[in-house]
Regions:
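Short, cationic-aromatic polyanion-contact patches
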Residues: 397-414
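Short amphipathic alpha-helical interaction segments
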Residues: 373-390, 395
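Alpha-helical DNA-recognition elements
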Residues: 83, 307, 386-390
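P-loop NTPase nucleotide-binding core
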Residues: 13, 19, 49-53, 57-187, ...
């Protein structure tokens, strides 16, 4: 066995010494199988009930799920689709992350066509847009001549990819074909609208009003700044349900930690929150501290979990003691500092936040604005939003304004 083989075996053994097959934390729920997602998905009962109540109605609905980046919108959406796949086999559910530079009609057309691999017309639509298909798509032509007998020659050639010229019409045709096979309806879930420019999102939504009110159910996810500021005020009738996801409370976060660990535990699964074994390799005290620091933000929770378990494995320990937890926090803090160092303006604002404790339009001074090289507070809001998206700050609503406070990891340093 080579040295590299030895190191691989040692790495695997270090995780197993923690009682786990693998590190279960992941920032990308789309990589998870439905069975795994069902095991780790925690909380959101009220929100799930609101969504599933709509599915007891024959009328097609349009649902908007919105919230800050990293709040768990994708996991929530995928859990709904997983349940519907099991409970509504006669409903076709599709999922797609919004590609850049595509309108919603074309995006929905791609999602639906991919979900119908046996439909030749659907696959032809994909092929014409240059999207690979399972079946080889050819255009067949014929040449015929007549003498004493009929003579026919047939030839096939590739169809050249083209941009969808009438995606709305093509989508309607494909929906009709899909509804013949799925009488309970078609649900098209479009994720990640928050990864687009807010102005672009508003344009997309305005242009897509026709398809959103068409023959399919729609579920969309996005950021409040990109969607709700426009749609929930000027176009309130576009969605039947606008659902905001907030941070999880501490008891739910603690239960989520148990579910994550159980999904990768080698044996001795335990889901009793009062049993210390349920959070192994954490100790009850370190599990509670970990959940407190994660602030109920699912993506931040996963980032911290990855760092803490990786640190524990590298140290070769079997339990996450307060000292090991602190080492894990130090590891992710180093990564955060490196990330900030690459962003000059965000770094300067974060340093000011660390000094001030909080920052808002009402509290920032003229001297501080000059120090940052701007003339008004509105100029730094986009940077504060990006810091929020990367879990460096959090928003704290106050009476007259939104204040931003820094997210600081616990430190044992004096």
């Amino acid at each position: 066995m080579t040295t590299a083989d030895d190191i691989f075996e040692q790495s695997a053994n270090n995780i197993q010494n923690l009682g786990l097959r693998e590190i279960p934390f992941t920032e990308s729920p789309t990589d998870l199988q439905n069975k795994t997602l069902d095991r780790i998905f925690t909380g959101r009962e009220k929100e799930l009930r609101q969504v599933f109540n709509l599915f007891q109605n024959r009328e097609r609905r349009r649902i908007l799920i919105y919230g800050r980046i990293g709040i768990g919108k994708t996991a929530f959406l995928l859990e709904i689709l997983s349940v519907l796949t099991r409970k509504r086999p006669k409903m076709l559910t599709t999922y797609i992350s919004l590609p850049s530079e595509l309108d919603l009609a074309t995006t929905a057309l791609i999602a639906l066509a991919k979900a119908l691999p046996d439909d030749d017309w659907a696959q032809r639509q994909l092929h014409q847009m240059g999207i690979p298909t399972a079946k080889e798509i050819k255009e067949r032509t014929s040449e015929a001549g007549t003498n004493a007998v009929f003579v026919g020659k047939f030839s096939e050639k590739d169809i050249a990819p083209t941009k969808a010229q009438y995606p709305t019409v093509s989508l309607e045709i494909l929906l009709d074909r899909a509804l013949e096979k799925y009488p309970d309806g078609v649900l098209i879930a479009i994720d990640d609208l928050d990864k687009q420019n807010p102005r672009r999102v508003r344009e997309l939504m305005h242009d897509a009003q026709g398809i959103l009110k068409g023959k399919a159910w729609f579920m969309l996810t996005g950021h409040p700044l990109g969607i709700t500021g426009d749609l929930l005020t000027s176009e309130r009738g576009l969605f039947d349900l606008q659902l905001k996801l907030e941070e999880l409370d501490q008891p739910t976060t603690y239960k989520m930690l148990i579910n994550y660990l159980n999904s990768a535990r080698i044996n001795n699964n335990c889901d009793d929150v009062n049993d210390p074994r349920s959070v192994l390799p954490f100790l009850p005290e370190t599990a509670k501290e970990f959940c407190r620091v994660s602030l109920g933000k699912p993506r931040f929770f996963n980032r911290l979990g990855n760092a803490v378990l990786s640190t524990a494995a590298n140290l070769g320990v079997t339990h996450i003691t307060p000292e090991v937890l602190q080492q894990g926090f130090k590891t992710i803090e180093k990564d955060r500092k490196l990330l900030l160092a690459e962003k000059v303006m965000e770094n300067r604002i974060f340093q000011l936040l660390q000094k001030r404790g909080s920052l808002s339009d009402e509290t920032i001074t003229i001297e501080e604005l000059e120090l940052l090289g701007v003339k008004s507070y509105s100029e730094i809001v986009p940077y504060l939003e990006r810091l929020d998206d990367e879990d460096f700050v959090q928003r704290s609503p106050q009476l007259d304004a939104i204040a931003y406070t820094p997210i600081l990891l616990p430190s044992s340093d004096p």
